[in-house]
């Protein structure tokens, strides 16, 4: 066997560089999977499918959307975190993607350490909606009605510790009223019960309730964003309605499992941004109630950190734990 000289050993790293670069350049070598932690037709699913086609063209491989609903998004989000094939990304929301471990210390993953932010795809303002029988046409009137009827107003959420729950609890604490929390497993069922009058109020993500607002089945009192929402421009903000409330905005993020190479994340983030910049995709999502973003990884990382600080504090203060 020939012995390598000192000079030959020194040259080895340089000789290996082209091979390493070539291996990185060939990624992806097979189809890419996007796990969506919610069912088909949900807002996270719509966001994933909005980038799916462009990503497939840009990456030169099929991109498959794999819906993994259940557990309020935690089951699918854990599947994203646990993927080890190097070809898996995932779409989830705040809660499963940020404060999940604070709400449930027994959760099988930690969003902060087991997920790598790729792109903040979109934001969705919340809308305070009520059944038409509620004698309130502004958020301030709703607060006054709730104060005059302590414990007699029921409101929906999509589960303990979700934004729809925390937004109402935060407003109730600030304004000094009590209401009965009725958690649901799905937005659709909560909206059906609101339309039927079985509950009186709901902080709903805009994309899940726009048709009912437009058809007059529910009354929109205020949006929770800092500015009016273009999809329903006649609905004022909470502050315009006379209620002291910080903005509450849902978000949809694209993540990768921890350990995914930074170059891969940067590439997918850039292509996701290009996909969402396409006019046709943008218009379709805006019509569905989205505020389209398509950010760099740093923006999503900051959003997760903000959620942990703000909403994590409320979860701890209220002593919230998941159902069951």
Task: Describe these PLM feature segments.
Residues 5, 72, 138, 183-187, ...:
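Short loop/turn segments at beta->alpha junctions
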Residues 7-23:
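N-terminal export signals
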Residues 23-113, 152, 160, 177-200, ...:
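N-terminal (or domain-start) structured segment
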Residues 29-31, 173-177, 214, 239-240, ...:
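An extracytoplasmic/periplasmic, membrane-proximal ligand-sensing/linker region
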Residues 82-87, 102-189, 238, 251-284:
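Hinge/capping helix and adjacent helix->loop/strand transition within the periplasmic-binding protein
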Residues 87-92, 200-204, 220-222, 312:
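Paired acidic/hydrophobic, glycine-rich loop segments that form the ligand-binding mouth/hinge
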Residues 91-96, 157, 187, 204-209, ...:
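Beta->alpha turn/N-cap motifs
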Residues 123, 209-277, 306-309, 323:
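C-terminal lobe and pocket-closing loops
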């Amino acid at each position: 066997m020939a012995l390598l000289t000192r000079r030959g050993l020194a040259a080895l790293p340089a000789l290996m560089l082209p091979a390493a670069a070539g291996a990185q350049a060939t990624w992806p070598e097979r189809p890419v999977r996007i796990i969506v932690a919610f069912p088909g037709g949900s807002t996270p699913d719509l966001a994933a499918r909005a980038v799916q086609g462009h990503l497939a063209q840009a990456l030169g491989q099929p991109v498959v959307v794999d819906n993994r609903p259940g557990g309020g998004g935690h089951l699918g989000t854990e599947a994203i975190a646990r993927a080890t094939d190097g070809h898996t990304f995932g779409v989830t929301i705040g809660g499963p993607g940020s404060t999940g471990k604070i709400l449930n210390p027994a959760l099988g993953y930690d969003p902060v350490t087991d997920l790598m932010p790729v792109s903040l795809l979109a934001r969705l303002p919340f809308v305070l909606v009520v059944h038409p029988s509620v004698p309130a046409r502004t958020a301030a009137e709703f607060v006054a009605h709730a104060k005059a009827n302590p414990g007699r107003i029921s409101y929906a959420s999509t589960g303990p510790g979700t934004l729809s729950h925390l937004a109402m609890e935060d407003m109730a604490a600030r304004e000094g009223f009590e209401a009965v929390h009725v958690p649901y497993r799905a937005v659709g069922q909560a909206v059906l019960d609101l339309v039927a009058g079985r509950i009186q109020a709901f902080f709903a993500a805009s994309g899940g309730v726009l048709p009912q607002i437009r058809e007059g089945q529910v009354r929109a009192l205020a949006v929770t964003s800092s500015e009016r929402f273009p999809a329903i421009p006649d609905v004022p903000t909470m502050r315009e309605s006379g209620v002291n409330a910080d903005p509450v905005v849902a978000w949809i993020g694209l993540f990768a499992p921890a350990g995914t190479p930074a170059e891969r994340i940067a590439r997918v983030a850039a292509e996701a941004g290009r996909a969402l910049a396409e006019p046709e995709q943008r218009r379709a999502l805006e019509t569905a109630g989205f505020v389209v973003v398509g950010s760099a990884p740093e923006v999503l990382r900051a959003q997760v950190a903000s959620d942990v600080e703000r909403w994590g504090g409320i979860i701890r203060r209220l002593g919230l734990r998941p159902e069951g």
